[in-house]
Amino acid sequence: MPRGLELLIAQTILQGFDAQYGRFLEVTSGAQQRFEQADWHAVQQAMKSRIHLYDHHVGLVVEQLRCITDGKSTDADFLLRVKEHYTRLLPDYPRFEIAESFFNSVYCRLFDHRSLTPERLFIFSSQPERRFRTIPRPLAKDFFPDHGWELLLMRILSDLPLRLPWQNKSRDIRYIIAHLTETLGEDALPRCHVQVANELFYRNKAAWLVGKLTTPDGTLPFLLPIHRTDEGELFVDTCLTTTAEASIVFGFARSYFMVYAPLPAALVEWLREILPGKTTAELYMAIGCQKHAKTESYREYLCYLAESDEKFIEAPGIRGMVMLVFTLPGFDRVFKIIKDKFAPQKEMSAAHVRACYQLVKEHDRVGRMADTQEFENFVLDKRQIDPALMALLRQEVPEKITDLGEHIVIRHLYIERRMVPLNIWLEQVEGQQLRDAIEEYGNAIRQLAAANIFPGDMLFKNFGVTRHGRVVFYDYDEICYMTEVNFRDIPPARYPEDELASEPWYSVSPGDVFPEEFRHWLCADPRIGPLFEEMHADLFRADYWRALQTRIKEGHVEDVYAYRRRQRFSVRYGAISSTANSS
């Protein structure tokens, strides 16, 4: 093959990535108009479309390369030269880090996820660390309270690009100052200043102002979720100033933000200071660069593995009927493989399970469903696998693993954030912690349902507790849309002996769900039953679920808050308006 072909292929891949990220920015840039027009269904569609862009453009490039090479074989040396040329194109390229991930994706698509070695792929970045730490142009603007905080906040809100009128800007400013005074103290406030990101972060029905609050004691997050009333007027819903609150806002169980980021590495670096607990992968995930986040997640895994002598073990908790789950004892993620054969009561296929996981990836996760990264041909060193887990792998997923002697290759798996299974958590806590967990579980069910998601299997073992105490759903094999379910009341028994019979006295069709039955397994524990009846008894009524279905079918998109209701200004300081209240 002509030697110039390697450069042409490298340029074709980079141009393909340019096209992909250009479309990514184009979809993102429409977020302001969608927010201003309250086109919430378009918000949901844009989210799905943006996720699909990456794989679509990888496919286009792969087809181009097949035409360019004209079906001729390409040996290992040829491929290495392509990567060398590609690497030489990156020093002056502004989105070098994601361009490397795009190269990896094209390679994997071309070669069916095989021969994934550091020589052929960008397992680690080719660029020096300083490129990740450099912010080439200002991403934010500083505001100082030289003439008081009221004027400072007036300038910040007036500088926003939003074209809608404010409902009551002066009132919102008073609320923000009241919160800051309560949090920092009246004496400290004059010695603080704010740095605000140039771009708003859009998600669901809110436009988030993201900033840094510099105080005498350090830097805090400064987050203002801006909403619009039904009449099209803007208001600030709350002010968040702790790293824990910011971590939840940027959490792994939430949809990706729409934020215009032509220099994603610079934005990630800017965000680190107010999100110190987030990994690089989590930050890229939060701003919508989910494929590069997968690259960073794999790098974090490799770094952990290199510094640890731990062995892979089966994950704690009740063994799943569909998924085999394993982990490293000190690692904050789990590895999930679809079993070759499911338990008899699980009447579904592996393809159905994968479709459920893809549904979650594309849907609004409302802070209640864990995000996942999907991997193919995942290699494990057998010396790092506990013998009990190795035996379990051979028993449950023999069709998914290939034994290469010192290593095994797992054909397909998911990596997901590790949490404490809710059933284990409930066994370990008492008092207020128990009450909080039950409240969180019920809230998770409600918020998923309002987002048109029915979990299917609602047992506690299918939910996890995060480090912030939030309850998150993570078992997706029975997930479906709310609108696909037929919620029914159990008919009255015909005779007294009906209730003692082993079979129901009424017909049951596919898709039928009887909420009254939830009580049997959710309230069996005498510590939990009374709490559940107190806080979530309506979940046992079919009419509650049917009412939600009606709202969904009528086109209602519910508000989703990344903070407690009691933190809203309308609750803390007075009503904002009847149209602004959460449903």
UniProtKB/Swiss-Prot annotation:
One of its GO terms (cellular component) is cytoplasm. It comes from the Bacteria. The keyword Ribonucleoprotein does not apply. It is found in: Cytoplasm. Keywords: ATP-binding, Cytoplasm, Glyoxylate bypass, Hydrolase, Kinase, Nucleotide-binding, Protein phosphatase, Serine/threonine-protein kinase, Transferase, Tricarboxylic acid cycle. GO terms for molecular function: [isocitrate dehydrogenase (NADP+)] kinase activity; AMP binding; ATP binding; phosphoprotein phosphatase activity; protein serine/threonine kinase activity. It catalyses: L-seryl-[isocitrate dehydrogenase] + ATP = O-phospho-L-seryl-[isocitrate dehydrogenase] + ADP + H(+). The active site is at residue 371. ATP binds at residues 315-321, 336. One of its GO terms (biological process) is glyoxylate cycle. Its EC number is 2.7.11.5, 3.1.3.-. InterPro entries: AceK_kinase, AceK_regulatory, Isocitrate_DH_AceK. Bifunctional enzyme which can phosphorylate or dephosphorylate isocitrate dehydrogenase (IDH) on a specific serine residue. This is a regulatory mechanism which enables bacteria to bypass the Krebs cycle via the glyoxylate shunt in response to the source of carbon. When bacteria are grown on glucose, IDH is fully active and unphosphorylated, but when grown on acetate or ethanol, the activity of IDH declines drastically concomitant with its phosphorylation. Belongs to the AceK family. This is Isocitrate dehydrogenase kinase/phosphatase. It comes from Salmonella paratyphi B (strain ATCC BAA-1250 / SPB7). The gene is aceK.
